[in-house]
Amino acid sequence: ERKIQEPYVCIAVQSTAQAKHWNNGPGWAEVVSHLKELGYRVLCIDRNAHSGHGFVWNHIPWGAEDFTGALPLQERVDLLRHASFFIGLSSGLSWLAWATRIPVILISGFTLPNSEFYTPWRVFNSHGCNGCWDNITYNFD
């Protein structure tokens, strides 16, 4: 059953490593603002509204609705399957969105495009960090 009647988009702005995040200062705020101008509600479905260590912290983007929390997997699936599309990073929520068969815009760089599922909507810049995670000569521990 669809609980939210208005058109909406799900986003997930966090991942397991800071290098997997979209470290573009105003990037998420601009995306959320644009989507809202197009008439979408924007739901952030990360586990936590804030995460980080030391002096580097990531927060739910300004203007996004807080649907974070330790939700059962089925509740996240229900949110995703009724979304118009999903925007996220190289993370488990992106895979979950892909599994629900909605369009996924994947922002990546730390991993190579062939490390994840195929999506025609991939944001990937090969001029910065690209594929670092897939290079076995790098020690991330």
Feature locations, PLM:
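Short regulatory "switch" loops immediately downstream of catalytic or recognition motifs
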Residues: 13, 44-56, 133-141
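Leloir-type glycosyltransferase catalytic cores
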Residues: 1-2, 119-141
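A broad, structure-centric signal for solvent-exposed, well-ordered loop/edge residues
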Residues: 18, 74, 114, 130-131, ...
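Residue-level signal for pocket-adjacent positions within structured domains
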Residues: 17, 62, 127
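Donor-binding and catalytic core of enzymes assembling or modifying cell-surface/extracellular glycoconjugates
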Residues: 22-115, 120
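Mid-sequence helix-capping/hinge segment at a functional interface
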Residues: 1-21
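Active-site donor-binding loop signature of nucleotide-sugar glycosyltransferases
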Residues: 13, 69, 109, 125-127, ...
